[in-house]
Amino acid sequence: MKKLLHGALLCLGLLLPLSAAHAASGYTQTRYPIVLVHGLFGFGQLLGVDYFYQVPAALRADGAQVFVAEVSALNSNEARGEQLLQQVQKIIAITGAAKVNLIGHSQGAPTARYVAGVRPDLVASVTSVGGVNKGSAVADIVRGVAPPGSVSEAVASAVAKALTAVMQFFAGTTGQPQYPVGALDSLTTAGASAFSAKFPQGVPTSACGEGDYQVNGIRYYSWTGSATVTNVLDPLSVPMGVLGLAFGSTPTDGLVSACSAHLGQVIRDNYRMNHVNEINQSFGLVSLFEVSPVSLYRQQANRLKNTGL
């Protein structure tokens, strides 16, 4: 009897890890493919480093089908949105899926909203991560010191284009068209307001509330950080802290206020993360006292899965 019991327990011990592994393998397995959309000065990979650092691999490891979009690093929401739409159509053709789940960081959020607005039949959900949905005080300041047609605007545009060209070279991309002025105008409070007038889906009508959770069959979600200097080892923490001064006492991740980042169902708007931490940058050097950014993407994939998306 003891031998039989020992054998049964041994078999159970061997089966439990297999069962747990099988359960974990489907944690992020959404019904529709996930498409990650980068923000301003963004890229797919730069010298082998993901813009969404370690996120695609973490999602794929537990079953998600993940694609990383590559749109203009510097351009208007509409121009980037058209580029994203073309890529979404290709992804649907390749996978045979009926729709995709869009997850956009920073300007990637309004870029995703554009696609959802013009082709709602191709989108299952839009998730905004630190999204510039109501504009940025930083963009407002830049536009103030570089007004339309000014020398300062021309100089800033040339510098931004040169920086983007270098990034594209190291990213090994052929390059999408770059239009810094279009990007800047899209990110100002006025520009974001004009964009939302055309694409209001999921955008809160109050100053800092939630938006509609579902519009035209598309689910809308958002989360963001509200800290600036989060890890002294991260070389981007100090710049985030300096940029955050533009917001005064308003909670911000350094580039976008917490309220501006709201879209649809607000999962949380006060993570101890700055704008780059939200994509697990720089190189995973994030706050030691907050949940891992990668975990948030995994949790969102599981949320989409449980919603049937």
Task: Give, region by region, the residue ranges found by the protein language model.
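Extracellular/periplasmic catalytic domains that process cell-envelope and extracellular macromolecules
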Residues: 26-30, 60-61, 94-95, 103-104, ...
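Flexible, membrane-associating and regulatory peripheral segments of lipid-active enzymes
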Residues: 1-61, 309
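Serine-dependent carboxylesterase/thioesterase catalytic core
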Residues: 38, 66, 82-193, 253
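Serine-hydrolase catalytic core
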Residues: 171-231
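Conserved alpha/beta-hydrolase
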Residues: 55-74
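Short aromatic-enriched loop/helix-cap "lid" or pocket-rim segments at secondary-structure transitions
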Residues: 48, 137-142, 231-236
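C-terminal catalytic-base region of ester-bond hydrolases, centering on the histidine
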Residues: 205-309
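Solvent-exposed loop/turn segments at secondary-structure junctions
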Residues: 39-43, 72-76, 105-110, 131-135, ...
